[in-house]
Amino acid sequence: MSTLRLLISDSYDPWFNLAVEECIFRQMPATQRVLFLWRNADTVVIGRAQNPWKECNTRRMEEDNVRLARRSSGGGAVFHDLGNTCFTFMAGKPEYDKTISTSIVLNALNALGVSAEASGRNDLVVKTAEGDRKVSGSAYRETKDRGFHHGTLLLNADLSRLANYLNPDKKKLAAKGITSVRSRVTNLTELLPGITHEQVCEAITKAFFAHYGERVEAEIISPDKTPDLPNFAEIFARQSSWEWNFGQAPAFSHLLDERFSWGGVELHFDVEKGHITRAQVFTDSLNPAPLEALAGRLQGCLYRADMLQQECEALLVDFPDQEKELRELSTWIAGAVR
């Protein structure tokens, strides 16, 4: 029986692909070496310990239907579109060695005619007239008996959108969590015009087989049917949930302030696991009672625009004369936390 396994995903769904990756990683025999090739449509992928509100322009992502996906490895935030090729190498210990998987990717690039080299802890760079440019970033995860190395290759990514979604709004977030390091990047199409995802996958596959001296048939993972993988439905449900992608953010505080025609308002939220643990309201409004009531209602509320709006509008029953103020407040808060 071969010790190699090759999987290729036809899905562009980041939650689907990360769930497949997690399933394979959990159930693979310790003697197996796995290569999984995939790509995602418009997605910001954040590291396990990151705060999406700090790392991303979550409002613009929502407007443009860009998904958020939290991965199980560490590292920083990256934007994926179909101009990226994603790879995952998995192996049991002691065979797991990220220098081997890095060399396989470098060999694949070399076979395509690109001379790249490893830089720092997790990047691959090429030399250009403007200096070194990053074409690949990686992240890693290890457990007691196995590990994986996954990363992306920039083929023809829309680099203008990197700045759109990875530069967060200037929110007043006093947040813990790992801050992404921005790097100067370039696409492989600058060096190899017309290079395709299929060509890159083929080159990585050949380099993978060459390193281990054996070949296997590819297993195609299709979004059209549920993969025959242990606990896939459960893992996909978690991977696609708000509780995992947003709610796992490290604790942080968010300070909002705005001046309305009826008075100034300052809101201070403390947020843990995606829930507001403390809400304070300060105002010079002549009628502060609705705002004081709102602070009480927001305690324990999910830090999500629709939930905050719901709590604001629930106050209309008790404060019908302040409908205009409460609706203005509701719209403002929802916009500020998106």
From Swiss-Prot:
InterPro entries: aa-tRNA-synth_II/BPL/LPL, BPL_LPL_catalytic, Lipoate_ligase_A, Lipoate_protein_ligase_C, LipoylTrfase_LipoateP_Ligase
EC number annotated for this UniProt entry: 6.3.1.20
Keyword ATP-binding applies: yes
Binding site for ATP: 71, 76-79, 134
Organism superkingdom: Bacteria
Cellular component terms (Gene Ontology): cytosol
Pathway info: Protein modification; protein lipoylation via exogenous pathway; protein N(6)-(lipoyl)lysine from lipoate: step 1/2; Protein modification; protein lipoylation via exogenous pathway; protein N(6)-(lipoyl)lysine from lipoate: step 2/2
Gene3D superfamilies: Bira Bifunctional Protein, Domain 2, CO dehydrogenase flavoprotein, C-terminal domain
Annotated ranges, domain BPL/LPL catalytic: 29-216
Positions of transmembrane segments: none
CDD domains: BPL_LplA_LipB (cd16435)
Any one GO biological process: protein modification process
Any Pfam family matching the protein: LplA-B_cat
Catalytic activity as recorded in UniProt: L-lysyl-[lipoyl-carrier protein] + (R)-lipoate + ATP = N(6)-[(R)-lipoyl]-L-lysyl-[lipoyl-carrier protein] + AMP + diphosphate + H(+)
Record keywords: ATP-binding, Cytoplasm, Ligase, Nucleotide-binding
UniProt-recorded Gene Ontology molecular function terms: ATP binding; lipoate-protein ligase activity; lipoyltransferase activity
Subcellular location: Cytoplasm
Primary enzyme class: ligase
Recorded family membership: Belongs to the LplA family.
Subunit structure: Monomer.
Functional description taken from the UniProt entry: Catalyzes both the ATP-dependent activation of exogenously supplied lipoate to lipoyl-AMP and the transfer of the activated lipoyl onto the lipoyl domains of lipoate-dependent enzymes.
PANTHER family in the record: LIPOATE-PROTEIN LIGASE (PTHR12561), LIPOYLTRANSFERASE 1, MITOCHONDRIAL (PTHR12561:SF3)
Note in the entry: In the transfer reaction, the free carboxyl group of lipoic acid is attached via an amide linkage to the epsilon-amino group of a specific lysine residue of lipoyl domains of lipoate-dependent enzymes.
Protein's UniProt name: Lipoate-protein ligase A
Native species: Shigella boydii serotype 18 (strain CDC 3083-94 / BS512)
Gene: lplA
